[in-house]
Amino acid sequence: MGICASSEQLEHVHETDESIVYVKDEQGRGGRGVESGGARKVASLFSQRGKKGPNQDSVILCQGFGMEDGVFCGVFDGHGRCGQFISKLVRDYLPFMILSHRNALLLADAAADDDDDAAFSDDAAASSSADSSGNSSPQPSASASAQMLEEWRQACASAFAAMDGELKLQPNLDCAFSGTTAVCAIKQGRDLIIANLGDSRAVLATMSDTGYLQAVQLTVDHKPSVPEEAARIKRSGGRVFGLKDEPGVMRVWLPGENSPGLAMARSLGDMRLKRHGVIPAPEVTSRRVTGADLFMVLATDGVWDVLSNEEVVSIVCATPRKQHASKAVVEAAVQRWRAKFPTSRVDDCSAVCLFLHDHTLGTAAAASAAAAAAARKARRASTATPPAS
C-alpha cells in the first residue's frame, strides 16, 4: 500500500487542524472533527491544542472494523517540526494498513487450510481400507481465538513497519527528527488487541472482586529510562542521558551530535535515529473482556504527565454523560498543568474513552466514590519538575 501526501494536502491538514476523525466503517466513510451519534454509543473522543504551537495530537475511531461490531481507536502524539503532519498521516493510514495486512493473513490461512484439507482427504482415502480405526479428524494446534489474536498481532507488527517505511518515502515530509507515538486498541467481540509504541498510554478500568474500581495499565511507556530500551539504543550506537536542568528525563542522542534529544525510545518517523535503536516496532498485547471490565482510556502524555491512571479512571466515572468523558479528562489535565507548572507551556492533550458495555458508567458510578478518594489522595502529591516535551 503506497501513500503520497502532496505539499497542498499537508498544508490543508495544518490549516484545518482536524485532530479527530470518526470513521463509520472500514471503507473509510465517516466524518471529521466531530463525533457522530454512532460514535457516542461506544466511545468518547477529545483533543485540545496546548500552548506550544499547532496541535500535534491526532485521534481516530473506526466502527465496523474487521467485523460488524468491531472497533478501532487510536491516539497519536506527534513531535518535531513536522510532528502534526506525521501524526495525522499515521492516523489516516495506519488503521487500514493494519486491516489490509490482517486480511492478507486470512487469505493465506484459507489457502493453507484448503491445501491441508486436500492432502488429508487423499491420505484418508488411501488408508481407509487398511485401518478403519484411524478416521478421527486431526485436532487444531490452537484455538480459533488464539489464531485470530496471533493474526492481529502479526498484522499490527507488519503494518507499523510498513507505515514507517511509507513515511520515509514521502517527498514533502521531513521525518529526520520528526515522528509520532501510536497507541491503538482493536476490539473484536470480547477480544481486545492493544498495539503501542512511544509514551502514549492505554489504561483499563475494571471492577475488583471486592467491588472497588481499579485502573490497570495495559501498555508500557517506551521511554529511554526503561533499561531494556536504553540497552538497545546503546548497542546501536545511540546515547542516552538527561540534561543538567532536567536530570531525571532521559533522552536519545545521536553518536556524534548533541541532537535531537528524543524523550522516547520507539516511534514512527525520526529516521536519523532508526539506525541507533529507536525502533518502529509496537508492543502488541491482548486481553479477553470480562463483565468486570468497564472502559479503557487511550491518551497522549499531555494527560499522563499530570494525571495518574487512577485519577483518569475516576474522572471518567464521575462524568454523568459518557460522550463527555474524554473532554472531562482533557480539561482536568489542562487545569492540572496550569496549577502544577504555572511557568510551563501546556502540552497538547488528547484522549479516547472506549466503553466496553452499554451499562459502563452506571456500573462504574457505584465505585466512583472510592475512585474519587484515591484521586484526591493523588492530587495532594508534591509538585515536581515539568515533564519532558
From Swiss-Prot:
GO terms for biological process: regulation of intracellular signal transduction. Binds 2 magnesium or manganese ions per subunit. Residues 121-145 have a biased composition (Low complexity). Keywords: Hydrolase, Magnesium, Manganese, Metal-binding, Protein phosphatase. It catalyses: O-phospho-L-seryl-[protein] + H2O = L-seryl-[protein] + phosphate; O-phospho-L-threonyl-[protein] + H2O = L-threonyl-[protein] + phosphate. Mn(2+) 1 binds at residues 77-78. The keyword NADP does not apply. PANTHER family: PROTEIN PHOSPHATASE. This is Probable protein phosphatase 2C 12. It comes from Oryza sativa subsp. japonica (Rice).
